[in-house]
């Protein structure tokens, strides 16, 4: 669990595998927001493009 995000890391999300986080809330999103958080984590997904 990332202290700045309400979701657990290690899950997967619905956006394309090539997306990156512009403004990430989770430190693990610095790598790839699509692989750091599970579905439903709006705090991570909002930074995806």
Curated annotation (Swiss-Prot):
Give one GO molecular function term: metal ion binding
State the GO CC annotations. Answer: cytoplasm; nucleus
What Pfam families is this protein classified in? Metallothio (PF00131)
Where is a divalent metal cation 5 annotated to bind? 34, 36-37
Q: Where does this protein hold a divalent metal cation 4?
A: 33-34, 44, 48
Q: Binding residues for a divalent metal cation 3, per the UniProt record? A: 15, 19, 29
Specify which residues bind a divalent metal cation 2 according to the UniProt entry for this protein. Answer: 7, 13, 15, 26
Task: Name its GO BP terms in alphabetical order.
Answer: cellular response to cadmium ion; cellular response to copper ion; cellular response to zinc ion; detoxification of copper ion; intracellular zinc ion homeostasis
Where along this sequence does the record place binding of a divalent metal cation 1? 5, 7, 21
Question: Which terms are listed as keywords in the entry?
Answer: Metal-binding, Metal-thiolate cluster
SUPFAM superfamilies xref list? Metallothionein
Q: Residues annotated as region Beta?
A: 1-29
| Binding of a divalent metal cation 6, residues | 37, 41, 44
Region Alpha, residue ranges: 30-49
The similarity annotation says: Belongs to the metallothionein superfamily. Type 1 family.
Sum up the protein's function in the record's words. Answer: Metallothioneins have a high content of cysteine residues that bind various heavy metals.
Record-given protein name: Putative metallothionein MT1DP
From which lineage does this chain's organism come? Eukaryota, Metazoa, Chordata, Craniata, Vertebrata
